[in-house]
Amino acid sequence: MTFYAPFCLPFIIGAAVMFAVLAWKWGTWLYRLPRADKKRILFGLPTRRTFGAAWEVVSESLLHRRIFRVNPLLGYMHMSLAFGWFLLIAVGWAETIAYLGFRYVPLQGHVFFKYFATGLEHKPFFDFTMDLLLLFVLSGVALAWGKRLYSRAMGMRRTTKHVPGDRVALSALWFVFPARLVAESATCALYGGGGFLTGSLGEWMSGHIGVMPLMNLETAAWWFYSSCLGVFFVALPFSRYMHIFTEIPLIFLRRYNLRSGEKESSYDNFQVEACSRCGICIDPCQLQSVLGVDDVQSVYFLRDRRYNMLRLQTADNCLMCGRCAEKCPVDIDLNSLRVNSRDKMHNVPDERRYGYFKGLDRSEGAGKVGYFAGCMTLLTPRTMSAMSAIFEAAGEEVWWADREGGVCCGRPLKLAGETDSARKMMKYNADLFRKHGITTLVTSCPICLKVFREDYDLPGIEILHHSEYILRLIRAGRLSLEHGAMRFTYHDPCELGRGSGIYDEPRAVIEAVGELLEPASTRENALCCGSSVANTAISDGQQVQIARSVAAQLDATGAEVIVTACPLCKKAIGRGTKSEVRDLAEIVVAAIK
């Protein structure tokens, strides 16, 4: 049996180009990894992490479980295309073995097996199974066509605006499986066989189309099928569909603890090109839903970075609230990629940023517990006064790092991309904390909390947000609170909730003093207040617009007081509502017996 026909040529060329480009990209990216990352891969290979990564590939790259959580119909669409095509390949491979044994069959022989196997006795099991899988994939294609017409049916208000290369690949992919159906059915019409789908369509064709036109149709259909595959394969490495072959190594590398950092690295390529541009990140973005800004979302940031088209406006206009990352089905570390892109654009060390604090120490008090207010808390003095009262009520001796002013934690500069200047600030504060011998560091600012935990080297110092610290005091019996009838609603700050995973502690504190009413968007889905220090592009008026939309949802709970656990959120939400907005520490002080 000869496994070649002229129509195979587009497929063969396309597959050769695709695999050559994939090998070049993977090889280059892996080669350029730093030695430490290569060691992580080497030591991670013979561990359980490899098995965990393999399972994640099945559950996410094929079954798309994260997308199912967004919308079941959307999840089914992605699964039918990915898992269905995979099964067509796997079962098709088994089919050739069932017919021919383990003899060598070239790649095109497997792909176009129905064309080459016309003289063989048909096996009903494979005819039925392959038709069932083809129908499975075709159902996904139909849903993809429908999504283009009405995306809301799949829970998406907005879809991605694709570049021309993506449209070429998308068009080719959409026609691959309908073309396969017609080609295989035409062959069945001429030579018999086929399952419930191709066989039935083939019978219809043979009854309505003459032999010569049918032979011409068969040839044209196989050419079209092969050409669609060839075009798709050539376009794939340069389009959004590169994610098919990039998400898999990304999952393994992530399991081996490779991460994106403050500076761009070769590992970033795996993250950037693993983006499928599915558009799931668009709807959660408040810049889009509130302000109508629709060209800076993560999908466009990653696209522009990949093609070296990234503009300052796109890189800087992001709240970095994490709402999009929470929904990303590939789990790309979007904020880290933003930071190192900004670092590349903005990081020019400036002595004026940090020169002023050489030798500066305005701290006061003594004690093993230290309190770092942070810049934003200093702008909301009631929060710091409340913490002072709580420390006094608990009998805590406290060292105050910055009650009379001090040095910023450094995170705002880091988020702006000025990482070298930020590191100077971090070193100063870390030295100050160690100098005064504290063992616990409490802060009321989630921005400070996150940078202390992730970027500071503070061995032997426990770092707590004031919500965690207050709850500890309550449970230890060091604070006696009176539970009242006041109704509160709680706003989850981005850096505290999605950023640091602290959701339960603030709620437990609120429930110790009154009734908690949850807003519509809460916990992982909580809205950003709009005044993020990470966004240097939107105006003050636009920040207020976002704050009003957040406050409206909080007011809708019917609560008497809006509570938050971030000084920046407190100020922002306060500008968007006439309701009373308090910090968590303030309602605790009011309830102390």
Report residues per predicted region:
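Iron-sulfur cluster-binding cysteine motifs and their immediate structural context
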Residues: H243-T246, S276, I280-R306, L312-M345, ...
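Sequence context surrounding c-type heme c attachment/ligation sites in exported
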Residues: N269-S276
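Short coil/turn segments at secondary-structure boundaries
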Residues: R69-G75, Q288, D316, R353-Y354
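Short, charged low-complexity linear segments at domain edges
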Residues: I244-Y267, V290-N308, S385, Y503-A512, ...
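Aromatic-flanked redox-active Cys/Sec active sites in thiol-based oxidoreductases
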Residues: V272, A315, R403
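Short, function-defining helix-loop hinge/capping sites that tune catalysis or transport
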Residues: F86, C188, F233, I248, ...
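Membrane-embedded alpha-helical bundles of multi-pass integral membrane proteins
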Residues: M1-S266, I282, M345
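Iron-sulfur cluster-binding electron-transfer modules in prokaryotic oxidoreductases
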Residues: M205-M212, G261-K263, N269, E326-K327, ...
